Structures are given as C-alpha cells and as structure tokens.
Amino acid sequence: MNKITTRSPLEPEYQPLGKPHHALQACVDFEQALLHNNKGNCHPKEESLKPVRPHDLGKKEGQKGDGLRAHAPLAATSQPGRKEVGLKPQHNHQNNHDFNLSPLAEGATNRAHLYQQDSRFDDRVESIINALMPLAPFLEGVTCETGTSSESPCEPSGHDELFVQQSPIDSAQPVQLNTKPTVQPLNPAADGAEVIVWSVGRETPASIAKNQRDSRQKRLAEEPLALHQKALPEICPPAVSATPDDHLVARWCATPVTEVAEKSARFPYKATVQSEQLDMTELADRSQHLTDGVDSSKDTIEPPRPEELLLPREETLPEMYSLSFTAPVVTPGDHLLATMRATRLASVSEQLIQLAQRLAVELELRGGSSQVTQLHLNLPELGAIMVRIAEIPGKLHVELIASREALRILAQGSYDLLERLQRIEPTQLDFQASDDSEQESRQKRHVYEEWEAEE
C-alpha cells in the first residue's frame, strides 16, 4: 500500500477523494450529538463564520442546525480495478465534554460542504480511469514510490492523510526504459538491409546519436567481403591496443588500401560521414598501422594524413575562396626577416681577431705629471697614425697626428659617426678643430645675431 499525503481539505483548491458515506454520516451525527449535549455547559462563544453554500440558500435563520447535516449517502459502487480512497479516521472525542467544541463544529461544517462534491469527483476519477485503460498493457512493472519530504516545495500542509490502494493491472508487454536499439537484418545475404527496432522509453539526443554510431560500427564490422576478393593479407601487428573500438581498428588494419580507396570512390558520402565522426587520434593510429605494415616496394596508395582530411588542397583553394579569399600582404619587413639569419658567436670573435691583426696596434704609456698616452696605429689605407690622449683637469684631450690625406678621411668618418650617434641617441658631441678659431667663435654667437647687417 502506497501512502500519499495531500493538502488539508480546508483549502478550496484541493478536493478529497471519496469515502464510504455511512462512516461520514456516523461521524457527523456524533459531532452533532456532542454539540447538542454540551450546549448548556459551554461558555458563550462567538458564532463561527460559515461560507455561503448552495443548500443554505432559502433557509431561515432558525434552521442553522440543518446545515451541519450531510446529504443522504449515495450507494457505494464497487468496480474492479478501482482505487479505494478514504480519509484517515479522526480521534474519538467522547471523553472531551469539558473542552470548547467550536473548532470541532467548524471542521464538521467544512467537511459537510466538501462531502457534497464527492459524486462529481467520483465521476472525474471514473472518466480518467476509463481514458487510461487502453494504456494498461504498457504500465506493468511501473511503480510509483511517494512519500513526505521536507525539501519538496510541494509538501502538503494539511492534517488529513490519504491512503491509496492500487490493484494489479493486467498487461502483456513490460516497459523497458533507456534501452539501446537492436538491429535485426531482414536478409543475411543482402548487404545493408536492416531494421532498427526501438524499445519503449525516453531517449536523449546524445543516446540516440551513440546508438546510431554503435549500429553503424557493428554493420561495418559484420559487412561481408566481395566475391572477387581473395584472403586478406595480415598487415597489422598481432598485438592491438585494447580500445573501445577494437573490432573497428582491426577491420581497418586488415582491409587493403586498394579496397579502402574503391569503397571511398563508390560511397563518397559514407566515407565523409565516417571520417567526420572519427577523431584525430584514431586517424593517426590507423594511418600508422597502414604505413608500418605495407611493403614500400609494392605499388600501393599512400594513406591520407589527418591534416589532409581536414584541410583543403592547394589547388582547390582558389575555387573555394575565389570570392572571399584575399592573399596576405607582404611588407618589406617580411622580406628582410626572411633573409636574416642568426649569427654565431664564434664568427664575431674571429672578426675581432682579424681586425686586430690588420690594425697592428701599439700602445705606449708614459709616466709623469703630464699623464699623456700615445697610441700608434698602422692602417692599410691611412698609413701610420699616432693618437695622443692627454688628461687635463676636468677634460680629456685627444690629438691625432697623421698625413693630410689621412686627416681628411678621418674628418669625414668622424662626421658620419657623429651623425649616426645623434640619430641613435641625441647627445652633446662635437668635433672641433683648433685652427678654425673663427668658426668656433661663430658657433658661440646668438642665433639672432646672424640677421644683423655687417659693416
């Protein structure tokens, strides 16, 4: 027996199920007797407010007691397979003569009002049962376990409990929930003839896709070989890793490459769908098995690589992207980066050694108060050059002694060096000659003095 708790019958939106009317009439008569016997002993109490009922219309004020009586009980009808529904019996109040019975009277009034609608509710239940009777063969084995839970948002708040007794329903076919489809071939000799039988139950899109994929893989594994084909050569290693698709991997390895190419040509849509469903790891494993087992000396078709299955070929790019495809912009910096290469550290040291050998540097340091340092250089193009470095308080004096042609080349090189240094980092650098005193004094003039007229 299943126990179902409903809302209190005092709430108008919930209707109690039917009960044998003789028990209801006895309960109401008992409550009326208690009210009549204790009418003089009870303290004066306020009249309880009662809702207006259809059977109270047209009655006089003195006939209030008649409203507590329920209508005559209807003949109880028993039908096979119907649920016996009833209210839990109330506690006995025979020893409670000294208590205030106004709540009891109010409860009896409300019950009498609700019991009048039992006949209409019985008709509704009977119509629902008649509508559900054709579904009886599909409902065998389905049980409904119900109970009270404090966490449920629809927990009833009433005081009465409802008891439901279910009778067994005859059925011929049990219900199977969430089962996989079974594939039954119509003709074992026919290739591709099959019937998918679905069981009764709720299936999600993910489970449907998985079932279809399993049936397709099973069909590929059990597909008969061609009549003109000979025994398959063993091109796969004997030990195959245990994966969920062991039979599929074994079949792929055992199938020659030529047969795979012929099937792909005959059924392009089938090959495309199958390649889309397989992930990259499976494709890589299968291509590895094919390349390891096939002899390279024989004329065989090279298996496609995983990236070739996903990316289009180069010759199809202009056709596919003729409208939207644009060539990438190549800048001069891209060409420069393409020509640049990383230099080795050893090459830099070798170049420094060669430069030192060609310069033939001689360093002479003389002691004394003057602190003058002389540097003698013998250059291939400039010839012999002497550099004198004198340390003056607060300054460093550098003097170059060379031929006239060498000094001209050095002046041009110093100008170029100064210009490049100013571009990299602007600093206050200046190369001045001691002979041009007029030019030095002219640089010290103010900029506005250049506009004055000379006398």
Swiss-Prot record:
Residues 43-69, 439-449 have a biased composition (Basic and acidic residues). InterPro entries: Flagellar_hook_control-like_C, FliK-like_C_sf, T3SS_YscP_C. Its main location: cytoplasm. Transmembrane segments: none annotated. The keyword Iron-sulfur does not apply. Belongs to the SpaN family. This is Yop proteins translocation protein P. It comes from Yersinia pseudotuberculosis serotype I (strain IP32953).
